[in-house]
Regions:
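Conserved helix-turn-beta segment immediately C-terminal to the redox Cys motif
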Residues: 17-36
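Thioredoxin-like thiol-disulfide oxidoreductase module
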Residues: 31-47
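C-terminal cap of thioredoxin/glutaredoxin-like
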Residues: 58-71
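A short, hydrophobic beta-strand/beta-hairpin element that forms part of a small beta-sheet core
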Residues: 50-59
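Local sequence-structure signature of Cys/Sec-based thiol-disulfide redox active-site neighborhoods
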Residues: 1-23
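ATP/adenylate-binding site constellation spanning eukaryotic-like Ser/Thr protein kinases
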Residues: 7, 47, 65
């Protein structure tokens, strides 16, 4: 399962979600503004900005269609 860590009013977060929805990829959304307990997890992974997209050991930040394709 793919997890997208998002924030409110995050344009790249919206783009990543739409990209995955358009391709029928199932994903879980965790909004860091609404669930701040996940912020520490994101920081431990080495990231400071949303979106952070995680599937197993494959984790990256930002909207990157090339990296998103690797999830499929």
């Amino acid at each position: 399962m793919v997890t997208i860590y998002t924030k409110n009013n995050c344009r790249q977060c919206m783009m990543a979600k739409k990209w995955m929805e358009h391709r029928g990829i199932e994903f879980e959304v965790i909004n860091l503004d609404e669930s701040p307990e996940y912020v520490e997890h994101i920081q431990e992974l080495g990231f400071k900005a949303a979106p952070v997209i995680e599937k197993g050991d494959f984790v990256f930040s930002g909207f990157s269609p090339d990296k998103l394709r690797q999830l499929v």
